[in-house]
A protein has these predicted regions:
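A shared catalytic/ligand-binding motif for oxyanion handling
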Residues: 1-165
Length: 165
């Protein structure tokens, strides 16, 4: 199926996906928003519980979960697009997943959940290791757990007059 001139992708840190009502509300939200691809971070699912990622109309589900209820990422692809999987890669800590495939042309999608401790170094290392594989059809999303500005690094910083809103 042709997808037109754009590809809608949503990314969301779900902060745990074990409560049935939360899964149901998220499934309804995904169906209402109707993106082609949905990337989730912090699924907190055990490997055996990945059936909980099911959403009606979304049969292609790629996940990286652990045997403990922490971390975890997933990429869900809508049945409305003809995604053909070529390869999948995930780390043993289940902090990222990369899928390579094609829709109308080759595409690579990486979904990252950086650990709270050492997040900046983790993201730098990830991007450095992926450097040779990144091209115009590479999409990298996720929760990088890094501050956007120096003001966000520490809540103990005093605000000067120019920084106050």
């Amino acid at each position: 199926m042709a997808i037109g001139p754009y590809l809608s992708i949503f990314t969301l840190n779900v902060n745990g996906f074990n409560v049935p009502t939360k899964r149901q509300r998220l499934a309804e939200w995904i169906q209402k928003q109707d993106p082609y691809i949905c990337c989730l971070q912090e699924t907190h699912l055990k490997t055996r519980d990945t059936y909980r990622l099911k959403v009606k109309g979304w049969k292609k589900i790629f996940h990286a979960n652990r045997d403990q209820k922490k971390a975890g990422v997933a990429i869900l692809i809508s049945d409305k697009i003809d995604f053909k999987t070529k390869a999948m890669k995930r780390d043993k800590e289940r902090h990222y997943i990369t899928i390579k495939g094609s829709i109308q042309e080759d595409i690579t999608i990486t979904n990252i959940y950086a650990p709270n401790t050492g997040a900046l170094q983790y993201v730098r290392q990830m991007l450095t290791s992926m450097k040779r594989e990144i091209n115009n059809n590479t999409i990298i999303v996720g929760d990088f757990n890094t501050p956007l500005t120096h003001m966000e690094i520490s809540t103990k910083q005093k605000l000067t007059r120019e920084h106050k809103l």
